Amino acid sequence: MILGCGNFGGIGSAPAFFGQGETLEQALDLMDAAWEKGITWFDTADAYGGGRSETFVGEWVRSRRPDGLRLTTKTFNPMAEGEDHGLAPERVRRQIDTSLERLGVDHVDLYLAHAHDPDVPAAELAGVFEELVAAGKIGAYGVSNVDGAQLRDALAAGSFSAVQNSYSLLDREVENEVLPLCAEHGLWFQVHSPLMGGWLTGKYRRDEPAPEGSRMTLRSGPYEHLRDDRTYDSLEALERRGDPTTLAFAWLLADERISVVVGPRRIEQLEPALAALAQPLSAEEREAISAEFPLVAQS
């Protein structure tokens, strides 16, 4: 399990929400709690909170000096309105240096291309990543938010070792190509958005307004397609089985091919993920839950 730090100092990479999300004090408390629970891999990105997330993680690293911490960061998105974005080699070189400075470390264990850049050939991207490996700035590299064709191009171009995509009961597109490719080539598959913006927590109810401060009141665009009776039918079926958040995590964790990036806003939100680790689903239970989401398998 990996601690997602995307809400530190913002809400993901959206410039409109930079400066929101968790404060430094709240972020430090969350990292302390995760570390105490045995979560030793933290995931961030240069654009999360416009650099605030990396800065907060760096403050934790400098003040706690943890032994055995592993770090992932990513690049692609602009760090402010009007700034550049993409995976051009000169930008990647610049961004890793500024990321390392904010994080207060001399290298990260994993560096991800945060999105596909159609203007940068996969071989060119692999080349600059290999350069960073040789320089000791990154341990390994991978891609994020890619489809099957983009992943095949990457695999043909270099030694990409990890993929991080959205995956949940409400977003199963990766089952078609990406997950099988990862299994075939031995790639580490990491899941972001395991609760689909809170939809798998039970907070969104049929014919009721979204709770104030939830993703559906702040940034509903990626989730509007879920406002559908078929979605609510599946969610209600999940709730009849038990705590939906724990079950959503357990469904993912029952697949041994993957790791889950958990991004709590409060310390107590770590508990369902930890409970899922302690109470694994059988293959039969996972299959039964999968069958309850047949009409929302594609987002």
What spans do the regions from the language model cover?
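Conserved short secondary-structure transition element at the edge of the structured enzyme core
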Residues: 133, 194, 224-278
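Glycine/proline-rich, positively charged
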Residues: 14, 19, 81-170, 177
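Glycine-rich, positively charged active-site loop/lid region within alpha/beta enzyme cores that binds
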Residues: 4-18, 183-239, 258
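Glycine-enriched alpha-helix->loop->beta-strand junction motifs that scaffold or abut catalytic
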Residues: 137, 155-162, 181-190, 256-258
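Conserved, mostly hydrophobic/aromatic
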Residues: 3, 27, 42, 57, ...
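A short acidic, helix-capping loop that chelates divalent metal ions and anchors anionic groups
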Residues: 10-15, 78-84, 200, 269-272
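N-terminal binding-site loop/beta-alpha segment at the start of enzyme catalytic domains
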Residues: 1-69
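Active-site beta-loop-alpha junctions enriched in small/polar residues
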Residues: 6-8, 45-47, 74-78, 113-116, ...
